[in-house]
Amino acid sequence: MPATIRRVSAADVDAIAARQAGRSGQDPARLRDRIAAELSDSTRRLWVAVVSGAVVGYARLTRHDADQAVPDAAPSGLYLGGVVVDPLLRRQGIGEPLTRTRMCAAFAEEREAWYIANAGNHASIAMHSALGFREITRRFEFPGVRFTGGVGILFQASQENSHRELPAKLTAFRGAFSP
């Protein structure tokens, strides 16, 4: 199922909040406020996947600065996270273009990209591994994240070792996280 991937606009906030509320059970109004705030946060970038005019998925890329005082802190860098796809459309090719787009944006700024996952999220791990992410450690701390079952995995991808199609797309993302 082909999806159009584009940056999030203010017009997408309600659709994203509804999608996330359906997944997490959180209050849609609070989610709307948080997502709207993310649009003006220079450390975050958000994208949506659109099929037939409807937002069917979204994802974010976040700049994380490690707290050096925290033992086992995840390293500073650009982290792929927050992928949500309509449950009826999962495993139909929507998550991969969202992930490729975020990798291109990350690689336009840095030589590596990071990703964290619950050890039980086999579908996500398989997709990210196919795109060049490799496990770094299972012993790390990331602010505000607790993993179901208690086990998370920190992954890293480098420009040199990631999928060959990515470098050709990097030009469009130059400056995405520049001051």
Describe the role of every protein-language-model region.
Residues 80-90, 117-118:
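A short, internal acetyl-CoA/4′-phosphopantetheine-binding micro-motif in the GNAT/acyltransferase core
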Residues 85, 91-104, 126, 130:
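Conserved acetyl-CoA-binding loop-helix of GNAT-fold acetyltransferases
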Residues 2-16:
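A short beta-loop-alpha structural element at the N-terminal edge
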Residues 116-117, 129-151:
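Conserved catalytic-core motifs of GNAT/GCN5-like acyltransferases
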Residues 141-179:
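C-terminal "cap" of GNAT-fold acetyltransferases
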Residues 50, 54, 58-82, 142-150:
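Conserved acyl-donor/pantetheine-binding loop and adjacent beta-alpha core of acyl/acetyltransferases
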Residues 106-118:
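Conserved GNAT acetyl-CoA-binding A-motif
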Residues 23-51, 58-60, 66:
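Active-site rim helix/loop that mediates acceptor-substrate recognition in acyltransferases
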